[in-house]
Amino acid sequence: MTEYTPKERLYRALRKQPVDRMPAVCFTQTATVEQMEASGAYWPEAHADAEKMATLAEAGHTVIGFEAVRVPFDITAEAELFGCGIKAGDLKQQPSVIKHVVKNMEDMEKLKGYSLNEGRVGLILEAIKILSEKYGKELPIIGSMIGPFSLAQHINGDAWFGNLFTGEEIVPALLDFCSDFNVAYAKAMVENGADTIAIIDPTASYELIGGEFYEKYALPYQKKIVDAMKELDVGTVLHICGNTTNGLSIMDKTGVNGISVDQRVDIKTATDNVENAIIIGNLDPVAILWNGTPEDVAEASKKVLDVGVGLLSPGCGIVSMTPSANLQKMVECAKNYKY
């Protein structure tokens, strides 16, 4: 069989086309302290400096062996663009949202008139361009963003789930706004060199909102992004945290190329329940990748591969203290696997 470049290999794998072997990629957060030390680009500075962001993302390839580069390393830049307060994080902890900006319909005015060139969103686009210019012919360039449901929750804060259950008008208004932003942001990522988009939508979890609410308040807004990317022939992967087993068939309706699943999801059940997307996952990022040994990683990888996972990957974002040796073993297991 033809030997493909990493870029060609992932393109084909996400579309269920034959490939020579499994791509070794990660669609969730990739940075670790050991990569920071090797590259000289550290958190929290790398969250807010395009050159450092690109340098640290590059370390996922040069240090670990991932056959793609991915930015950013958190899911708060979008909320920050709209005025939410952000705790910057530190060497080991990612940034987090600590202040929300929309309480009612009148507050929606605060969100208008944004520019994708401003703030960390603009820096992420710049980092994508840097990575694309260096690696774009050979490696997949993955642009990652928070999904519309979780972005709306970041903007609305603790009131979000209450508003959801009481059917407040702020809910569809925010979801329309956020998904329109997501589409514009994804298109800007592609314009700057991204060829694959990862949508991270943790609070849209089946465990939190159930199937009925997911189908009403998450599915159509995620699908809006996917449809826009399909028009550009850009692959999409959706990651939602928690045990999403019972919601996977609904998630598949988004039309994404890949569904990234949490370590609590049974891979065999997932592959049986999902008709269109490939299943991505789902090594435990804490018990196996952070606290395990390379031997543990190899054993866990074999179990996941044996039941037919589409792409071997962590079940969630990589913990910053994860040893490089464990991630390198995961990469090795993926590269050695032929479908």
From Swiss-Prot:
Methyltransferase involved in methanogenesis from methylamines methanol pathway. Catalyzes the transfer of the methyl group from the methylated corrinoid protein MtmC (MtmC1 or MtmC2) to coenzyme M, forming the substrate for coenzyme-B sulfoethylthiotransferase. SUPFAM superfamilies: UROD/MetE-like. It catalyses: methyl-Co(III)-[methylamine-specific corrinoid protein] + coenzyme M = Co(I)-[methylamine-specific corrinoid protein] + methyl-coenzyme M + H(+). It is an enzyme of class 2 (transferase). This is Methylcobamide:CoM methyltransferase MtbA. It comes from Methanosarcina acetivorans (strain ATCC 35395 / DSM 2834 / JCM 12185 / C2A). Zn(2+) binds at H239, C241, C316. NCBIfam families: methylcob_mtaseMtbA, mtaA_cmuA, PRK06252.1. GO terms for molecular function: [methyl-Co(III) methylamine-specific corrinoid protein]:coenzyme M methyltransferase activity; dimethylamine methyltransferase activity; metal ion binding; uroporphyrinogen decarboxylase activity. Pfam families: URO-D. Its EC number is 2.1.1.247. PANTHER family: METHYLCOBAMIDE:COM METHYLTRANSFERASE MTBA. GO terms for biological process: methane biosynthetic process from dimethylamine; methylation; one-carbon metabolic process; porphyrin-containing compound biosynthetic process.
